[in-house]
Design a protein with these regions (language model features):
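Glycine-rich phosphate/dinucleotide-binding loop and adjoining beta-alpha-beta core of small-molecule
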Residues: 1-94, 105
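Small-residue (G/A/S/T)-rich helix-start motifs and N-terminal tracts that mark the onset
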Residues: 1-8, 82, 89, 94-134
């Protein structure tokens, strides 16, 4: 994978937490096949897997939270084994999905830093600065 030759990985979103246990090999037609339920299985946790393989490389993950933002990010950091979590408070009108700004905290193995409300490009620059210091 590309991570083998990378200096760092920034995992900005979970690709999918679950996937169908038995994917269909054809389009399911509404008229022909009744779909009562879809059995799901957990997918590989990419952030945790990259963190296990990181060696001296840096791995940063994200957490979109609506409450207990820092506490949940600290738990995620410990659980995943990455170098830092960028925790976004998506309960705010000026942060997260569908906005141009984010209210975030950097939660790392060396401590927690609350950031002001930043534009997404400003937050990206802050994350790149963080990478240089990890």
């Amino acid at each position: 994978s590309a991570f083998q030759t990378a200096d760092a990985a920034i995992c900005a979103a979970a690709v999918a937490d679950y996937t169908p246990a038995t994917p269909a090999d054809h389009k399911l037609k509404k008229a022909n096949e009744r779909l009562d339920r879809i059995e799901l299985v957990e997918t590989v946790d990419i952030l945790a897997e990259l963190s296990r393989q990181k060696g001296k490389r840096c791995v940063i993950g994200f957490a979109a939270e609506t409450d207990n933002v820092v506490e949940y990010a600290e738990r995620k950091l410990a659980r995943k084994g990455c170098d830092a979590i960028i925790a976004n408070d998506v309960s705010r009108a000026d942060s997260g999905f569908g906005t141009d700004t984010n209210k975030a905290w950097i939660v790392s193995t060396t401590g927690t830093q609350e950031l002001p409300v930043l534009t997404k490009p400003q937050l990206a620059d802050t994350i790149l600065d963080l990478l240089q210091n990890l």
